[in-house]
């Protein structure tokens, strides 16, 4: 809520507020001008201009708006104009500290249909996806009753804001962190949500789950990006994240101990996430900080297929150790 103490100018056909000072519930100040024209308070139209400085500009819980919820403190301008049939919001803001926003574009009732890390029958998965022809984002405009609302947000996102992108509300996969970039958000009571712009993740974590057995927080590397091109479901992600641990290199093969100065070595489990939010591709890799190039070359000789890399990642994340395959290591040793 907002409060003000100032003069209201009234006449027979209009109500006016002229550059008054308003205060949000946290005591932050802004300036508002309003012109409300009417004919006996019917056939009305209005124009509101807002100049805010670190003010509470958005505050919605998940029930009010399940797609975009949280609190936004921002500085900038907003214009609201309309009548009894149509109301337009044009907002140009820069995020400020204490902003915490949640983006959830997955339908909780059908989130598993878009689970991109799962072991299921592909034909069954395709049938399930086809059966969800009703776009989950239509929740924005469930009714056509009342005045139509059209909203256009131009946002300058700064690292002050905490942003959480929910990938899978059932499994708990989510990207949480701080970002920078420019973002345009358009939606209304009779139109689908559209988003445009590039967001660069400055720091954050990817809460990764696999079959709801593994739950690990991967640290997102600087330079990871999310590009919005309209439909949020088709946002393009390029995420690189790591999970640090220490493991016994001898569990992979005893011969590797000859190249390593110690038994337990630092290991980075690397997760690469690329593609559309709806169904990104995921791949894994391993890095060995503080180890020499020859040791890494020898390790990659044992782990030379995608299946073996995935198996090693699962073992490292679940058991904190390398997977040992005697037949496989024997063949690899013979080749070397």
Where on the chain are the PLM-derived regions?
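Strand-loop-strand
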Residues: 1-324, 336
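Conserved small/polar residues in nucleotide/adenosyl-binding loops
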Residues: 328-335
């Amino acid at each position: 809520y907002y409060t003000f103490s100032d003069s209201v100018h009234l006449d027979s056909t209009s109500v006016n507020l002229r550059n008054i000072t308003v205060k949000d519930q946290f005591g932050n100040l802004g300036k508002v001008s309003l012109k409300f024209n009417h004919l006996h308070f019917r056939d009305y139209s209005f124009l509101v201009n807002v100049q805010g400085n670190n003010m509470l500009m958005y505050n919605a819980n998940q029930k009010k708006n399940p797609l975009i919820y949280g609190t936004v403190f921002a500085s900038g301008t907003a214009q609201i104009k309309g009548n009894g049939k149509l109301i337009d919001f044009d907002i140009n803001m820069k995020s400020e500290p204490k902003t915490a926003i949640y983006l959830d574009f997955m339908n909780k009732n059908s989130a598993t249909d878009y689970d991109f890390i799962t072991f299921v029958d592909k034909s069954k998965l395709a049938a399930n996806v086809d059966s969800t022809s009703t776009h989950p984002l239509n929740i924005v405009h469930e009714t056509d009753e009342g005045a139509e609302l059209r909203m256009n947000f131009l946002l300058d996102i700064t690292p002050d804001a905490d942003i959480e992108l929910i990938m899978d509300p059932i499994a708990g996969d989510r990207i949480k962190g701080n970002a920078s970039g420019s973002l345009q958000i358009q939606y209304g009571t009779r139109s689908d949500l559209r988003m445009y712009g590039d967001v660069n993740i400055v720091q954050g974590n990817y809460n990764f789950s696999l079959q709801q057995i593994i739950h690990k927080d991967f640290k997102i590397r600087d330079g990871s990006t999310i590009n919005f091109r309209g439909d949020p479901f088709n946002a393009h992600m390029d995420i690189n994240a790591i999970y640090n641990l220490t493991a016994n290199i001898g569990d992979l093969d005893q011969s590797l101990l000859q190249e390593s100065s110690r038994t337990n070595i630092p290991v980075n489990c690397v997760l690469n996430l690329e593609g559309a939010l709806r169904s990104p591709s995921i791949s894994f890799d391993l890095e060995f900080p503080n180890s020499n190039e020859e040791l890494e070359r020898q390790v990659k000789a044992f782990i030379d297929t995608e299946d073996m890399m995935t198996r090693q990642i699962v073992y490292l994340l679940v058991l904190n150790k390398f997977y040992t395959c005697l037949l496989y290591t024997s063949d690899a040793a013979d080749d070397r």
